[in-house]
């Protein structure tokens, strides 16, 4: 069985790198992109993604926008989406979870978050 493949979406290079490296330490293949549009283009052409971890606050489109695009697509709706944000805003957290996100984690993503996140694959 091949390693799980996670798409990491974050407009901040450091945050993309931190999440990617943490996942790779758990034998996860990672593709990292910097925008929702890049994520959607990648998902349109790539069929072996097992989960998406997305920042919430990004220019142009938010992680919630990505979540909505994924959930309305018959091809992608099955994918678990985890939203990561440095903002602990209860209304935003509820909106994402009600919209179908598997989890909403606070940044910086910590090593202790990974087993829970990886359990969604």
Curated annotation (Swiss-Prot):
Name of the protein in its database record: Two-component response regulator ORR12
Modified residues (4-aspartylphosphate): 55
Pfam families for this protein: Response_reg (PF00072)
Phenotype upon gene inactivation: Dwarf, narrow leaf and low tillering phenotypes.
Function: Functions as a response regulator involved in His-to-Asp phosphorelay signal transduction system. Phosphorylation of the Asp residue in the receiver domain activates the ability of the protein to promote the transcription of target genes. Type-A response regulators seem to act as negative regulators of the cytokinin signaling.
Tissue specificity of this protein: Expressed in flowers and panicles.
Domain Response regulatory span(s) in chain numbering: 5-121
Classification via Gene3D superfamilies: 3.40.50.2300
Source superkingdom: Eukaryota
Gene Ontology biological-process entries: cytokinin-activated signaling pathway; phosphorelay signal transduction system
Native organism: Oryza sativa subsp. japonica (Rice)
Post-translational modification: Two-component system major event consists of a His-to-Asp phosphorelay between a sensor histidine kinase (HK) and a response regulator (RR). In plants, the His-to-Asp phosphorelay involves an additional intermediate named Histidine-containing phosphotransfer protein (HPt). This multistep phosphorelay consists of a His-Asp-His-Asp sequential transfer of a phosphate group between first a His and an Asp of the HK protein, followed by the transfer to a conserved His of the HPt protein and finally the transfer to an Asp in the receiver domain of the RR protein.
UniProt KW keywords: Cytokinin signaling pathway, Phosphoprotein, Transcription, Transcription regulation, Two-component regulatory system
Family recorded in the similarity comment: Belongs to the ARR family. Type-A subfamily.
